[in-house]
Amino acid sequence: MVAIRGVAHFSIPVSDVARSMRFYTEVVGCRHLSTTPNGQMVFLDVAGTCLILVKRDAPINPVPDNHGGVHHAFAVAHGEYAAALEHLRAHGIEITFEEDRQGGVLNGPRVYFHDLDGTVLEFIDLTSYAGSPS
């Protein structure tokens, strides 16, 4: 078996790298690390994991309101969920779905929204995770 230590990075395709970098730093709360010289990729830090925004020339086909399918979830600090929700609203972000899910693998209140290209994102106050070491 391979000993995986964690997620090194994940990437999200975007139509406008500079515009998306502003969204992911100002709205989502990521920290800018680097931009490639040609401006086609931006590297962001998400609490120790690298998120790469990658320029796509072909149309990106989002799945609207797909909160149960492909999406990217960002854990907010415990007790900061209400402030994160207000932060989204203050930036004019439309909330597509909100719930407090309990009794599953990933538990806690969560909210779903879209980035500028329609990628589904989630903020969650992760109160428990079934995969946590005992």
Predicted regions and their residues:
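N-terminal beta-strand motif that seeds the catalytic metal site of vicinal oxygen chelate
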Residues: 1-18, 72, 127-134
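Vicinal oxygen chelate
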Residues: 3, 6-15, 45, 62-87, 91-134
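A generic structural signal for short beta-strands and their flanking turns/coil linkers
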Residues: 8, 40, 49, 68-70, ...
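Core segments of cupin and vicinal oxygen chelate
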Residues: 13-52
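Conserved beta-strand in the GNAT
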Residues: 52-54, 121-122
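A short local loop/turn or secondary-structure capping micro-motif enriched for an aromatic residue
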Residues: 53, 59-63, 92, 129-132
